[in-house]
Amino acid sequence: MPELTFRNAEEKDVPLILEFIKKLADYEHRLDEVIATEEALKYWIFDKNQAEVIFALEDGKEIGFAFFFLSFSTYIANVNMHLEDLFIDPEYRGKGYGKALLRELAKIVKERGYGRFEWTCLEWNESSKEFYKSLGAEEKDWDVFHFTGQSLEDFINED
């Protein structure tokens, strides 16, 4: 039976992190939006310690990843783990690895004393929503807004 293990990413893993980001973006039909570079990932994850990555490994081979960072909740006056990306290679799905990776993250939340474990999900991704609900996660009534690129510039420079 295959063995599932986890490990924290190291600086040498930056190319692999970017590879998983692109695989996820391709799955989400958003590959054309990826402008991340190895240099930027190294800077923010390892030089500035603004995010963390954990790999899921089957028999020592990286088959998925979780990319997360901290946010803050004023209501509970505590930090939250925000899961930005979760991805398991398609050929390894259906083995419980996604659930196991989420459980590993939940353990980190508990061990570090964070207030919440949260993430977002694309509206069209019903299979992921059902998966999260089957684990007991609650869907919240929030819409996500953001400025990026030109919309950010336009807002800053608006008269």
Predicted regions and their residues:
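Conserved GNAT-fold acetyl-CoA-binding loop/helix
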Residues: 18-43
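Conserved beta-strand-loop-alpha-helix junction that forms the acyl-donor binding cleft
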Residues: 119-128, 146-150
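Conserved acetyl-CoA-binding loop of GNAT-fold acetyltransferases
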Residues: 114, 133-142
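A short beta-loop-alpha structural element at the N-terminal edge
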Residues: 5-17
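Conserved beta-strand in the GNAT
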Residues: 55, 61-70
